[in-house]
Curated annotation (Swiss-Prot):
Protein function: Part of the ABC transporter complex SsuABC involved in aliphatic sulfonates import. Responsible for energy coupling to the transport system.
Gene3D superfamilies with a match to the protein in the record: P-loop containing nucleotide triphosphate hydrolases
Gene behind the chain: ssuB3
Domain ABC transporter residues, every copy: 28-242
Family per record: Belongs to the ABC transporter superfamily. Aliphatic sulfonates importer (TC 3.A.1.17.2) family.
Residues bound to ATP: 60-67
Annotated Gene Ontology cellular component terms: plasma membrane
GO-annotated molecular function: ATP binding; ATP hydrolysis activity
Lineage, highest ranks first: Bacteria, Pseudomonadati, Pseudomonadota, Betaproteobacteria, Burkholderiales
SMART domains attached to this UniProt entry: AAA
Membrane topology: Peripheral membrane protein
UniProt name for this protein: Aliphatic sulfonates import ATP-binding protein SsuB 3
Sorted UniProt keywords: ATP-binding, Cell inner membrane, Cell membrane, Membrane, Nucleotide-binding, Translocase, Transport
EC number(s) stated in the UniProt entry for this protein: 7.6.2.14
Domain of life: Bacteria
Length: 247
């Protein structure tokens, strides 16, 4: 899927251009993306590539445009300018699990893809997230972590080329969050989608990502490869990029 949006004459030149280092095919490519809300520019001539199998974490202060970018990639928000080349229907997992309370777990997982996923595919996806045998259970019987596991199963049930994660672990307790991190890493390695994780948690980004981006004023301001730094050194760098004094 390619979406082109007319570029306004006053669009700024991108402040940061990424050079791909991974030979895998692109899962998504963004060029010159711009989004305005009235006079306020939320995304400013942004460029971004994510490759198949690459896990990218996006950090930034509240209001810098992270979620707006994710929604644009998901097709939930139309930019004012630029181009998006992305799978026609990427999968999205939000902070809230968004399960339908009147539908069983397998029906929630297969929602919108009943023909291609079906009960059998939903059962396999639920088994992958540790909920085997609970296909006919109801969302009301789940803990917060279990409900988010179902949301993740729904996101991966049809093997998407692009998986978008909008702070999916933010509402979970610390222990459940750690368990979910391990599960996500395992599932991404198995399914091999390109992943964009929007998060405020530097440590979460360090744990999960192959590449960490910092967004500032609607642009990608910095990009880091975790393997080129020690975790402690990169943590300090990222906190400084975010305007936080590290201890």
């Amino acid at each position: 899927m390619t979406l082109d949006f007319a570029l306004s004459q006053d669009a700024a030149v991108p402040a940061f251009t990424e050079e791909p280092v991974n030979p895998s095919p692109l899962a998504v490519s963004v060029r010159g993306l711009q989004r305005r809300y009235g006079a306020r520019v939320v995304i400013d001539a942004l460029d971004l590539d994510i490759r198949e199998g690459e896990f990218v974490a996006l950090l930034g202060e509240s209001g810098c445009g992270k979620t707006t970018l994710l929604r644009a990639l998901a097709g939930l928000d139309l930019p004012d300018a630029g181009q998006i080349r992305a799978p026609e229907r990427p999968s999205v997992v939000f902070q809230e699990h968004r399960l339908l309370p009147w539908a069983t777990l397998w029906e929630n997982v297969a929602l919108g893809h009943e023909t291609t996923v079906g009960r059998a595919g939903a059962a396999r996806a639920l088994a992958e997230v540790g909920l085997s045998g609970r296909e006919d259970d109801w969302p009301r019987n789940l803990s917060g972590g279990q409900a988010q596991r179902v949301a993740l199963a729904r996101g991966l049930a049809r093997d998407p080329a692009l998986l978008l994660l909008d702070e999916p672990f933010a509402a979970l307790d610390a222990l459940t969050r750690i368990k979910m991190h391990g599960l996500v890493k395992e599932l991404v390695a198995r399914h091999h989608p390109g992943v964009l994780l929007v998060t405020h948690d530097v440590d979460e980004a360090l744990t999960l990502a192959d590449r960490i981006l910092v967004m500032r004023s609607g642009r990608i301001a910095a990009s880091f490869q975790p393997e080129t730094h020690t975790p402690q050194a990169l943590r300090s760098i990222l906190l400084e990029e975010l305007g936080v004094q590290s201890l």
